[in-house]
Amino acid sequence: MEIPENIQHQLNQFQQLQQQAQAVTMQIQNVEVQIQESETALEELNKTDENAEVFKQAGNLLIKVDYAQAVEDMNEKLETLKLRKQTMARQEERVMKKLEEMQTNIQAAMQGLQGE
């Protein structure tokens, strides 16, 4: 049985959407790791005396920063990462919903072919 061109096109779109879903999932996992690292760094920073020397990594350099500024920077970074994760989670949800819809449509089209 040969698959009609329109169904083949839907299958190609479905595969592209699957790849997009995988990419979004990987990005979410990456952000989750960054969130964990930032939370750990912030916890360690909060355990540190406010008068202690604090350094921030900038590329290959460590730069001395003010303790309060370091805490503020880490909190901002953490907030940004959490917002990014929420945005990506919504994107993942939309992609997964679209995948389910496409799968249903493709299955219905294939069953229609078998009924012919």
UniProtKB/Swiss-Prot annotation:
Recorded hits in Gene3D superfamilies, A to Z, give:
1.10.287.370
**Coiled coil (residue ranges):** none
Name one molecular function that GO assigns to this entry. unfolded protein binding
The entry's keywords: Chaperone, Cytoplasm
Family per similarity comment: Belongs to the prefoldin subunit beta family.
Q: What does this protein do, in the record's words? A: Molecular chaperone capable of stabilizing a range of proteins. Seems to fulfill an ATP-independent, HSP70-like function in archaeal de novo protein folding.
Q: Which PANTHER family match?
A: PREFOLDIN SUBUNIT 6
Name by which UniProt lists this protein: Prefoldin subunit beta
